[in-house]
């Protein structure tokens, strides 16, 4: 079981997010330079603890008594939903100021390593808070169900969204973005932190203002640097991971590589190392051939290409440092970067690259819900055997025990990865339909008959097309829909641009790409 990457590279895969593939470490234990007991509660006065005797001690992830974030903040609309939690808009009761509250379900923090990682992320955000281009951290609160992180509200949206919305795009604009990203790297390294997961999705705009700052918002894989230590655990996101990470011998230079990948995308619209599978991406990274021949590279300045080459140098000892990048003639403030517009096709490719095709994921779930019982009799029995408390859902502990009974020797991290891959709605457990979707052979799920049934499910009026209204209704039924997502899906799937999806387009979507994904069994 698992996939061939685990055999060749010793790593496990996370579910795809926002059109990119991610890798998760085998061993997530990381070093800290800070006492967990010094984690801020976010208040200047002694907090009104609720039953501290009951809620203190080892049970608390933050190693402090529980504290209700709602005593200090009013939580309102949902801003976003990720693999590990939900982000809400929140308002501080004492000042009326607006912040973002990231709520991480404790069901997702099942291993000792998960809890250590959570504490470390908070420590690092506290350590870096107040620096330019880094989100300001307000405080951490823990209750019975979740750990809540309150931080600066970045109301300007995602980095790529802003670039795409502008229309006009130039080397100077790309240099401005890259300068802020590398400034984050420079600050992190100066303050003894290695980020380890730089990618566009981890940067937001501070406001909708034209001159808004770019802010780094996610430090979940970051570590305090131990001088002289060689890091070996494989972390990061597939397109952005440095070759030395795959070789399991790396240091802080990996952050410059990731920033160089982002710069390549900013200038061309696509990553330099591309393949349909994670294995293909990693093989391309290790081979290290960078394409400067295809469009738009012939029209990109030599100075820009020089910086990309220096940042994507295979040997980390010869790779340019963050401080040196900031002094490069093309990147520095008022430098050589031209304001001449870059080919508009770059923006189009960038949009396609970042668009996650949520419709395909939803279609597989619909197929699993409606598949004939006789086809899945064995899987049904397997689900019942693993669901030992007959709750109708499989918890992490049940999955771990069930795999052990089948003779599996997976590590805790690998079991956790399988759990996350199967848990589509992110509630910390696997329901029956999620189990079927994750365990059935993909070719059976995607048979012509099943694909047609899924199309009919979305095509409510039987017109032969999935309209915008039908798409919106289907996505919202599963809590996946917003206007931006619908537009991205249509852009990605609607080949003839008539504003609706016909059966041929739907089939092409279901057959395309099919990157290798982890299966439970």
Swiss-Prot record:
UniProt-annotated catalytic positions: 197 (proton acceptor)
Cross-referenced InterPro entries: CDPK_Ser/Thr_kinases (IPR050205), EF-hand-dom_pair (IPR011992), EF_Hand_1_Ca_BS (IPR018247), EF_hand_dom (IPR002048), Kinase-like_dom_sf (IPR011009), Prot_kinase_dom (IPR000719), Protein_kinase_ATP_BS (IPR017441), Ser/Thr_kinase_AS (IPR008271)
Its EC number(s): 2.7.11.1
A GO MF label: protein serine kinase activity
Activity modulation: Activated by calcium. Autophosphorylation may play an important role in the regulation of the kinase activity. Repressed by THI1 through a negative regulation of the autophosphorylation activity in the presence of Ca(2+).
CDD domains documented for this protein: STKc_CAMK
Domain EF-hand: 374-409, 410-445, 446-481, 482-516
Residues binding ATP: 79-87, 102
Start and end residues of each Protein kinase domain: 73-331
Annotated membrane topology: Lipid-anchor
Residue ranges, compositional bias (Basic and acidic residues): 21-36
Binding site for Ca(2+) 2: 423, 425, 427, 429, 434
Autoinhibitory domain: region residues: 337-367
UniProt-annotated binding residues for Ca(2+) 1: 387, 389, 391, 393, 398
Chemical reaction(s) catalysed: L-seryl-[protein] + ATP = O-phospho-L-seryl-[protein] + ADP + H(+); L-threonyl-[protein] + ATP = O-phospho-L-threonyl-[protein] + ADP + H(+)
Pfam family for this entry, one: EF-hand_7
Annotated coiled-coil segments of the chain: none
Alphabetized UniProt keyword annotations: ATP-binding, Calcium, Cell membrane, Cytoplasm, Kinase, Lipoprotein, Membrane, Metal-binding, Myristate, Nucleotide-binding, Nucleus, Phosphoprotein, Repeat, Serine/threonine-protein kinase, Transferase
Lipid linkage positions (N-myristoyl glycine): 2
Binding site for Ca(2+) 4: 494, 496, 498, 500, 505
Induction conditions: Up-regulated by abscisic acid treatment and drought stress, but not by thiamine.
Subcellular location per the Swiss-Prot or TrEMBL entry: Cell membrane; Nucleus; Cytoplasm
Free-text comment on this protein's domains from its UniProt entry: There are 3 contiguous domains conserved in the CDPK subfamily: a kinase domain, an autoinhibitory (junction) domain and a calmodulin-like domain. The autoinhibitory domain (337-367) inactivates kinase activity under calcium-free conditions.
Protein name: Calcium-dependent protein kinase 33
Organism: Arabidopsis thaliana (Mouse-ear cress)
Lineage: Eukaryota, Viridiplantae, Streptophyta, Embryophyta, Tracheophyta
């Amino acid at each position: 079981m698992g996939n061939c990457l685990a055999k060749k590279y010793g790593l496990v895969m996370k579910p795809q997010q926002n059109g990119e593939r991610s890798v998760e470490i085998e061993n997530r234990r990381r070093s800290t330079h800070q006492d967990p007991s010094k984690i801020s509660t976010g208040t200047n006065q002694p907090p009104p603890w609720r039953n501290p005797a009951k809620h203190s001690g080892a049970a608390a992830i933050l190693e402090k008594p529980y504290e209700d974030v709602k005593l200090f903040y009013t939580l309102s609309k949902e801003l976003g939903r990720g693999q590990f939690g939900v982000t809400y808009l929140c308002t501080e009761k004492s000042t009326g100021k607006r912040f973002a509250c990231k709520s991480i379900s404790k069901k997702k923090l099942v291993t000792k390593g998960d809890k250590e990682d959570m504490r470390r992320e908070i420590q690092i955000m506290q350590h870096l808070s107040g620096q330019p281009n880094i989100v300001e951290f307000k405080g951490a609160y823990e209750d019975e169900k979740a750990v809540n992180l309150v931080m600066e509200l970045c109301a300007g949206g995602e980095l790529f969204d802003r670039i795409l919305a502008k229309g006009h795009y130039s080397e100077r604009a790309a240099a401005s973005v890259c300068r802020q990203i590398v400034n984050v790297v420079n600050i992190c390294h100066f303050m003894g932190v290695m980020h380890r997961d730089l990618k566009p999705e981890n940067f937001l705009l501070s406001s909708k203002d034209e001159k808004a700052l770019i802010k780094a918002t996610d430090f979940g894989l970051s570590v305090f640097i131990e001088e002289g230590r060689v890091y070996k655990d494989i972390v990061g996101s597939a397109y952005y991971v440095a070759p030395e990470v795959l070789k399991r011998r790396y240091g802080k230079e990996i952050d410059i590589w990731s920033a160089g990948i982002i710069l390549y995308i900013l200038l061309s619209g696509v990553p330099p190392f591309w393949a349909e599978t994670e294995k293909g991406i990693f093989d391309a990274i290790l081979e290290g051939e960078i394409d400067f021949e295809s469009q738009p590279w012939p029209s990109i300045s030599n100075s820009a290409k020089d910086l990309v080459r220096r940042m994507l140098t295979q040997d980390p000892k010869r790779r340019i440092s963050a401080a040196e990048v900031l002094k490069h003639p093309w990147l520095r403030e008022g430098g050589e970067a031209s304001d001449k517009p870059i080919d508009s096709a770059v923006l189009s490719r960038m949009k396609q690259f970042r668009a996650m095709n949520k419709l395909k994921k939803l279609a597989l779930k619909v197929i699993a819900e409606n598949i004939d019982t006789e086809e899945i009799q064995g899987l049904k029995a397997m689900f019942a055997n693993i669901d030992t408390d007959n709750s109708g859902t499989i918890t992490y502990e049940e999955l771990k025990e069930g795999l052990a009974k089948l003779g599996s020797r997976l590590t805790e991290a690998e079991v956790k990865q399988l759990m996350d891959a199967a848990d589509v709605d992110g509630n910390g457990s696997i329901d029956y339909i999620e189990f079927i979707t994750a365990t059935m052979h993909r070719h059976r799920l995607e048979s012509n008959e099943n694909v047609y049934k899924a199309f009919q499910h979305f095509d409510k009026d039987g017109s032969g097309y999935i309209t915008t209204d039908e798409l919106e209704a289907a996505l919202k039924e599963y809590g996946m829909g917003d206007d931006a997502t619908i537009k991205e899906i249509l852009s990605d799937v609607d080949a003839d641009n008539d504003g609706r999806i016909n059966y041929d387009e739907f089939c092409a979507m279901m057959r395309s790409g099919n990157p290798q994904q982890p299966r439970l069994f």
